[in-house]
Amino acid sequence: MAVYRKKISPIKPTEAVDYKDIDLLRKFITEQGKILPKRSTGLTSKQQKKLTKAIKQARILSLLPFLNKD
């Protein structure tokens, strides 16, 4: 029987997710510019929703690209 361990959230529950913190947001985006899913990041549902909104807001304000064209 396999034992599964709960992933520890990389963002502390007290830490605020802000659209201006580009370095933090880039950790949760793939090379193509897609937002990583909750199951691979280890975030809680609340944190994932806040992160998604922050990434989308940063994209609209041109702080992050919609697509990475490399």
From Swiss-Prot:
Localisation: Plastid, Chloroplast
Any one of the GO BP annotations: translation
Disulfide-bonded cysteines: none
InterPro entries xrefs: Ribosomal_bS18 (IPR001648), Ribosomal_bS18_CS (IPR018275), Ribosomal_bS18_sf (IPR036870)
Molecular function (Gene Ontology), one example: small ribosomal subunit rRNA binding
Keyword Ribosomal protein assigned: yes
GO cellular component: a single term: mitochondrial small ribosomal subunit
A Pfam family this chain is assigned to: Ribosomal_S18
Main location, first listed in the record: plastid
Domain of life according to the entry: Eukaryota
Key word Plastid present: yes
Keywords assigned by UniProt, alphabetized: Chloroplast, Plastid, Ribonucleoprotein, Ribosomal protein, RNA-binding, rRNA-binding
HAMAP family, per database record: Ribosomal_bS18
Family: Belongs to the bacterial ribosomal protein bS18 family.
Quaternary structure and partners: Part of the 30S ribosomal subunit.
The protein's name: Small ribosomal subunit protein bS18c
Natural source organism: Porphyra purpurea (Red seaweed)
Organism taxonomic ancestry: Eukaryota, Rhodophyta, Bangiophyceae, Bangiales, Bangiaceae
